[in-house]
């Protein structure tokens, strides 16, 4: 065994051993407890970054730990390979996205293997593989049959930079989640998945996921946005129809003095047609549609609008209400129409003041003698209260009035109690090339026709010329576009939109259970064995994107009979970011640390250990070069501990726990079992790898103390061997290469991964005596040793009898003695 720790020499050796012996490949073993551990698979951007290293190191510790605990662990890896970034990068590099993607996959796979992650590579796939997305196309057809996939004209989020539509969940603060450029509203024909059919189940199950972070569940609940309220009809003054409004404040209806419509509302053009305001309204509508979405939803937005020239009727007062188009009303919420109650809604209040519209107070605070006059208001009163100036409902509390007013309007056919959701159907059409083709054709005679299952897959053509601006080449690619109608055999055109890449990531975890199955998308017996994922690990930024879509998709597949679970992920860990110099690592900030450089300098085990030790997994990790060097020094200490004493360790029998031991050895024996318990519980119960590693460091220190003072304790080596072997097994999930090498050098022939996880002895944990700190008036004055089973009264008596404590008491009366058993005693005089 070399004296010096040299990770380059040992790491490749053990990686090749693991691969040759296929130690990470698994199959279904009936009767053996399974554990499916999965980290969110990466987009093959070209190189892994430190965020990947941290994420995957966390998962690998758990996977290795559970294997050693006897679980049948599935730990797969693949590639989220479709999408705009690959297409844009390929255009820039003047190559094809497929070539760019698969070259990146090859390099990133080698990086992951260099880090020693215990993936079952036999299950690897990329979502751009035809063998994967062919089954996704089948799911689309099944959803189309059930009405869960449909096409309609809709105002959608359009990114002019990426030249494609975005789902609502992909708009962050009014900007594109990919390029951070403004998103505008554009009317287009789009394909949707009817996620709203599952809205109640999606919401209900957020209360049945105890292994998920509360923050993620709250984000999903807020995104679903369930509101109990009233749907009210406001007849148009012209008599030509009505405007439907959703409100949670029917109690304020008597104070509604005007109506606000979203610029995208379908009635706007008809309401202004032929009126003097028509051209002004249309200009306003066009400008509002081009505005940044986040600007329109901002609290500080300057409220603007235009009178349409039409009015509607307040259904309880009979008063005419002017109808405005307003920039702060959006179609995504409610019905795109807002009954404006300026006395009791701040946005309406600001709008009314600006345009000189009437303000009518109809709610007063419950503890107020009278309502304030409208002209006295400096802001809207938005709380519940008691109704005033509201006809027969005056004097009612808000909650009571909401029910009564809605019920009375329902009797007249002008209202009903209803539930409204913020969640909208998932728009999956993307006007880009690099994605899974939608299996639909259009025939002038037959209309929209699904591709027959026997004709799947619809293969994305590779012989295309990518356009410099990123627009899809498919509409101009005749061999793909032109086809025969499956119904009549006549000429037809293929759908040229591709599917949102989040469709691929909404079911990949199930495919990992049967990645090589070619008779269908999912092999039910295998999926039944492995699903659901027991532990999922990834970033919180996916809370209302990937995680919500995956939950929806699993419920759809369950109802198709393809799965037998209700939820995809039993437990979820959202790890923090890796930051440097106070900011998230990014090329633009110039603070990126390349994992390859770190591995070359320090080895994979050091990089892994630092990522695990520097911070709890749910917190951000601040990169520190000194911290990396410290991790390397620690592994070097373990190496030297064994290399310096290898012959003694090899030849010594292992301590079996029997017989009395001198105090230094008894303390080490006890420390060994305390460490086993601590590390086991920290990994199993809390994922607190940082405190587990700290406990291992303490054990190393204590082993060194015994070894360096060995002659005074007799034959130390059986107890030291017990401690060292436990140490190697405990550190192996974090630093597997060095653990394998040392384990082999100690004379073992099996891989560490195949060894059972060490068990602690309850007897060994019990010290025959414990040392207590004794304070007098809060200051350390002595230490005493008492039997481990001493009562608090016995501990107090021993402290007061101690000679050093008596010196500091010096005859003063003892006012109080505070005993913290097995830790500290404080004497107050």
UniProtKB/Swiss-Prot annotation:
The sequence motif named 'KMSKS' region is recorded at: 584-588
Q: Which PANTHER family match?
A: LEUCINE--TRNA LIGASE, MITOCHONDRIAL (PTHR43740:SF2), LEUCYL-TRNA SYNTHETASE (PTHR43740)
Question: InterPro entries this protein is in?
Answer: aa-tRNA-synth_I_CS, aa-tRNA-synth_Ia, Leu-tRNA-ligase, Leu_tRNA-synth_edit, M/V/L/I-tRNA-synth_anticd-bd, Methionyl/Leucyl_tRNA_Synth, Rossmann-like_a/b/a_fold, tRNAsynth_Ia_anticodon-bd
Keyword annotations of the record: Aminoacyl-tRNA synthetase, ATP-binding, Cytoplasm, Ligase, Nucleotide-binding, Protein biosynthesis
State the name under which the record lists this protein: Leucine--tRNA ligase
Q: Which Gene3D superfamilies would you find in this protein's record? A: 3.10.20.590, HUPs, Isoleucyl-tRNA Synthetase, Domain 1
Q: What is its EC number?
A: 6.1.1.4
Q: Which GO terms describe its molecular function?
A: aminoacyl-tRNA deacylase activity; ATP binding; leucine-tRNA ligase activity
The text of the family note is: Belongs to the class-I aminoacyl-tRNA synthetase family.
What gene codes for this chain?
leuS
Q: Residues that bind ATP, according to the entry?
A: 587
Motif ('HIGH' region) on chain:
42-52
Pfam families in the record = Anticodon_1, tRNA-synt_1, tRNA-synt_1_2, tRNA-synt_1g
Q: Where are the transmembrane segments?
A: none
Top-rank taxon of the source lineage equals Bacteria
**Top EC category:** ligase
GO terms classed as biological process: leucyl-tRNA aminoacylation
Catalytic reaction list:
tRNA(Leu) + L-leucine + ATP = L-leucyl-tRNA(Leu) + AMP + diphosphate
Q: Does the keyword Amino-acid biosynthesis apply?
A: no
The places in or outside the cell where this protein is found are: Cytoplasm
Query: Where does it sit, as one GO cellular component term?
Result: cytosol
Protein source organism: Syntrophobacter fumaroxidans (strain DSM 10017 / MPOB)
